[in-house]
C-alpha cells in the first residue's frame, strides 16, 4: 500500500470522461482537492476496467475524508465528507 491512515493526499485533477467512454467512481467535486486517509479498505478489482469487461487488476481502496470547506465555498458547518477512492487517483500533496 502506498498510503497509510493519517496520510495527507491529493486527488488527481483528471477528467478521462472527456476523452471518451469512461466509468469513473471518483466524484468530480473531490478532483484536485486535498484530503486525509482515514481507513484502508483493501484491494479490489478496478471498476473502471470491469465496466468495459476488461481485465481488472486489484487496486487499493481507501476512505479519504475532506473538510467541507475544502470542497464548497460556503459550507453550512465544519463537517467532513468521506469518499471511497482508489489509489491510482491519489498522490502525495
Regions found by a protein language model. Give the residues of each.
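Basic/aromatic-rich interaction segments and small domains that mediate binding to polyanionic partners
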Residues: 1-5, 10-93
Amino acid at each position: 500500500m502506498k498510503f497509510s491512515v493519517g496520510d495527507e493526499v491529493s486527488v488527481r485533477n483528471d477528467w478521462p470522461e472527456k476523452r471518451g467512454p469512461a466509468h469513473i467512481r471518483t466524484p468530480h467535486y473531490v478532483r484536485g482537492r486535498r484530503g486525509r486517509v482515514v481507513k484502508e479498505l483493501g484491494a479490489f478489482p478496478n471498476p473502471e476496467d470491469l465496466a468495459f469487461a476488461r481485465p481488472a487488476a486489484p487496486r487499493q481502496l481507501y476512505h479519504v475524508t475532506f473538510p467541507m470547506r475544502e470542497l464548497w465555498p460556503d459550507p453550512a458547518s465544519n463537517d467532513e465528507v468521506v469518499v471511497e477512492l482508489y489509489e491510482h487517483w491519489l498522490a502525495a500533496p
